[in-house]
Regions:
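A cross-taxon signal for low-complexity, glycine/charged-rich
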Residues: 4-8, 335-339, 346-349
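Short, solvent-exposed aromatic-acidic interface loops
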Residues: 122-128, 192-196, 254-260
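Leucine-biased recognition of intrinsically disordered, low-complexity hydrophobic segments
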Residues: 17, 31-32, 41, 339, ...
């Protein structure tokens, strides 16, 4: 990003922070997260707008160690809208502390059995800089979102593109790999699993990211439950993550600054990592990993009627996960769908 643009964005962010800090909180006590906490996190809380009032649903001093089901307050507050076969999305208004006083979370659920998933990359002609943005997403994308973390111009860790290993696995105790196999199924591999070459066979696409937000049984990692374990549990930023629901669908969540509307939504104010892990769990994720949020986080949802919703970032990124219509499904081929409908109508005569 040019220096002038960075300066302007920083200045706007500073002005916004002052305005948010001057805004009194509007939270009301309500139902807390599930019991069973051994948390020693710094004090913080999250509330959700129900349409009538703010309802507190999570507190750091009562943070659960495990998420086994969606939280009632979150499930009741979000209204899911169908974008296409196998894809639905919704939004939540959240209230936290400090610069997270007003947030919006955009959530997308994807059924990998009903769409095709692939990784897209984009770099400048010489390969010196990353170049992908939601504006450049392929025209047939139903969902497009930046994935992984990256170092300079390249993604961090393991990357498989179209069945070929592009980058070798990275190492880290809180890393998770997300794999799309040749049949279109999605599986998750923990930090120790990639050492086995057999696990890396039959992979169509894969990326690696960190930190893990929820392990396979919905457990919150120890490093996210108290300070001093390798994760900054106080830092606030815009967040992006991907998770797996109990029924195998994918959950993608992007947080946006919401004090002044979407025009300033890309300002990197947001929840802490423990708060974001709680949001993923409260939306039903049983396993989850953070992606590159901050000024990188960006996502697109395109409805079947052509309506496009885009949440833009401030920075170009090297890689994105794209969901598009499954070529074997009639809904991807309007003419085939019309013929099927006519045949079905004839059968009823």
């Amino acid at each position: 990003m040019p220096f002038g643009a960075v300066y302007r964005a920083t200045r706007v962010a500073a002005i916004a922070l002052v305005a948010v800090a001057a805004t009194p909180p509007r939270t009301e006590p309500g139902l807390l997260s599930p019991a069973g906490s051994t948390s020693s996190l710094p004090p913080s809380a999250l509330s959700v707008w129900t349409g009538r009032a703010w309802r507190e649903w999570w507190r750091s001093d009562a943070a659960p160690d495990r998420w086994t089901a969606p939280h009632d307050a979150i499930a009741d507050a979000i209204q899911w809208k169908r974008a296409a076969d196998g894809v639905e999305w919704g939004e939540l208004r959240l209230a936290g502390a400090g610069e997270a006083r007003r947030l919006r979370a955009v959530a997308v659920r994807i059924d990998p059995r009903l769409v095709r998933l692939r990784l897209d990359t984009a770099f400048t002609a010489g390969g010196e800089r990353a170049a992908w943005t939601v504006e450049g997403a392929r025209a047939d994308a139903i969902v497009a979102v930046n994935v992984g973390q990256f170092i300079r111009t390249l993604p961090w860790g393991w990357v498989v593109l179209d069945g070929r290993e592009f980058l070798a696995p990275g190492r880290g105790p809180l890393s998770t790999a997300v794999v799309v196999d040749s049949s279109g199924g999605v599986r998750w591999i923990g930090p120790d699993g990639l050492a086995d070459p057999a696990v890396r066979r039959g992979v169509a696409a894969a990326f690696q990211s960190y930190p893990t937000l929820l392990t396979a049984n919905g457990d919150v990692p120890d490093a996210l439950r108290s300070p001093g374990r390798g994760i900054d549990v106080e830092h606030r930023d815009a967040r992006l993550g991907i998770g797996a629901l109990a029924d195998g669908r994918l959950l993608i969540v992007l947080t946006r600054f919401d004090a002044f509307g979407e025009s300033l939504g890309s300002i990197p104010f947001g929840p802490t990592i423990p708060e974001f892990a709680a949001l993923m769990g409260a939306l039903g994720a049983r396993q989850a990993v953070a992606l590159d949020g901050g000024i990188s986080g960006q996502m697109l949802v395109r409805e079947q009627n052509g309506t496009t919703h885009a949440w833009r970032g401030m920075r170009r990124v090297p890689m994105a996960l794209v969901a598009f219509c499954h070529p074997e499904r009639d809904v991807c081929h309007p003419e085939r769908q019309r013929l099927s409908s006519r045949a079905a109508a004839r059968d009823l005569l």
